Amino acid sequence: MKVLLDATAIPADLGGVGRYVDDLVPELIASGVNLAMAVQQRDVAHFSAKVPRAHLFPVSQSMESRGARMAWEQTGLPALIHRIRPDVLHSPHYTFPALHQVPVVVTLHDATFFSHPQAHSPFKQKFF
């Protein structure tokens, strides 16, 4: 099975979702998954060493702002899906392309967006 994992949302310090992805990807490879990863340029060396059998696809634009990453997720990620034709897209950070051509697995690490929306900004309340 070919899985495309969108690792573009992980923070530079690999905290939180980054730690989850960091622990997940070697297990996917060990289980026989043909793993492709969309990664930020700054993470190429890390994931090349962590999972040398994964196919890395560095994103070409800066993902420093949330808006830029989300725009890429809705435009660049579908283009990458079309190009490499994975069986499944795994989005480990809540969001995924609105238009997608493959089954999607989304990991929710925190459900308070739904159970306690008042704890989040108005933008996140509406978005999630």
Enumerate the language-model features and the residues they cover.
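Carbohydrate transferase catalytic cores enriched for Leloir-type hexosyltransferases
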Residues: M1-F128
